């Protein structure tokens, strides 16, 4: 079951998260060899993300997870699309979009696929939105529009139930 939460964090916290994610720790190594995108690894080693923010996420979702598999961020610039994949390293995937402003025409939406590989559901990328879904679902992020000049960020938590 895919769950969507809008206006997930208060504006002040949203800005704080975005500022932390804009620190210069990005590497062009996400995705695969044929389809690279920006990646910010090892956020699970930062107390801000693995303690402070994790507790806020659990409280907001009203779920007690048994643990964290990984925390990282993906970043996409114009025309950088994701590759369809499953998150088999945890039961649930929590994504958070810390963007302060986003318009649907900018693209970068979260695409879920059916068993035949066709798009089954689209969750629009939206500022301060979060999405919780079973990691076994096939999904990918579509590319931001060629007119988008920023970094589309998704903060990812891989969680055990």
Where are these regions (language model features)?
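Non-heme Fe(II)/2-oxoglutarate
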Residues: 1-69, 76
